[in-house]
């Protein structure tokens, strides 16, 4: 359980970092668009979204819901530092990378293969962290027992 909180804290911290990189001319704070695939691997995003008080108290950063599962406000302490738009993409990681290439997505939660493929083709993207590391190991252990 402690690992998931640390991963979520890292996720929110990465949003804080990106908040300074994206500008929206119509508001005082930037708007970040975060795309994800609807899998259990990206549940950490919604752990952060659904537990703002926990993360505010423990880490000083939190997401507050404006429209559940779609729009949030990112706070550092009591200061709003970004608007966060959450976009569910059901067509796979390549679709997310297409959106990123088009400038429609700022942060993405997806597997490595499409990221590596698009970076190899020239897309300006960086992997900043793993959100899960042990799921494959558990599956393989069960398959080969």
Swiss-Prot record:
The chain crosses the membrane at residues 4-24. The keyword Transferase does not apply. GO terms for cellular component: membrane. Keywords: Membrane, Transmembrane, Transmembrane helix. It is a single-pass membrane protein. It is found in: Membrane. This is Uncharacterized protein MJ1180. The lineage of its organism: Archaea, Methanobacteriati, Methanobacteriota, Methanomada group, Methanococci.
């Amino acid at each position: 359980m402690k690992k998931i909180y640390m991963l979520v804290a890292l996720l929110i911290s990465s949003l804080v970092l990106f908040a300074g990189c994206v500008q929206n001319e119509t508001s005082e704070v930037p708007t970040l668009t975060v795309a994800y695939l609807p899998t259990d691997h990206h549940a950490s995003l919604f752990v952060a979204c659904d537990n703002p008080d926990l993360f505010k108290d423990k880490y000083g950063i939190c997401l507050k819901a404006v429209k559940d599962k779609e729009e949030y406000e990112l706070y550092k302490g009591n200061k709003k530092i970004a608007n966060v738009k959450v976009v569910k993409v059901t067509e796979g990681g390549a679709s997310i990378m297409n959106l990123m290439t088009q400038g429609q997505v700022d942060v993405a939660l997806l597997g490595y293969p499409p990221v590596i493929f698009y970076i190899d083709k020239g897309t300006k993207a960086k992997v900043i962290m793993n959100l899960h590391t042990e799921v494959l190991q558990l599956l393989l252990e069960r398959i080969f027992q």
